[in-house]
């Protein structure tokens, strides 16, 4: 029996490589910035590999509730009373079929940018782990990119019941 050694490097994706270092408490996206999928360059990923890591565990990739307004891109606005801080919790999933628009250079092409990241990770000889918790969702869960025929979580719930 041969055991395989795994060394996992966990990244809170929105912080890695963020050029804004002076965070404003309860600051907005414009004030505090956000890392992007494209910040994970071949050079940076190869450096992670050279440190001896075999896997990269990306946290906060799936679209979650936020106070950043992406309604111009067809993404529903979240009510601020149910969002944790301005950036939101990466575990308040808003759409399991989409990625966080904050992490994209171009919001309409966010999935292409994410898929390119996965390819870069594999090209660097690393495995990609996507962090998610299957039973944690935002209060206003609603997919805007779900496959045809896929019902949203809670769509058939009886709203008259507690």
Predicted regions and their residues:
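N-terminal structural segment of carbohydrate-active enzymes
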Residues: 1-127, 135-161
């Amino acid at each position: 029996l041969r055991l395989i050694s795994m060394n996992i490097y966990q990244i809170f994706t929105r912080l890695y490589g963020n050029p804004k270092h002076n965070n404003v408490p309860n600051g907005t996206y414009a004030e505090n910035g956000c890392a992007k999928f494209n910040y994970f360059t071949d050079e940076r990923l190869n450096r992670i590999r050279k440190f001896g890591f075999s896997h990269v565990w990306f946290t906060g990739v799936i679209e979650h509730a936020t106070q950043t307004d992406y309604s111009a891109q067809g993404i529903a606005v979240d009510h601020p009373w149910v969002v944790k801080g301005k950036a939101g919790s990466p575990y308040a999933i808003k759409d399991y079929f989409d990625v966080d628009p904050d992490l994209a250079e171009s919001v309409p092409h966010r999935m292409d940018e994410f898929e390119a990241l996965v390819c870069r990770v594999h090209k660097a000889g690393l495995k990609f782990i996507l962090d998610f918790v299957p039973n944690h969702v935002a209060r206003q869960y609603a997919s805007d990119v779900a496959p045809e025929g896929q019902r949203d979580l809670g769509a058939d719930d009886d709203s008259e019941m507690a």
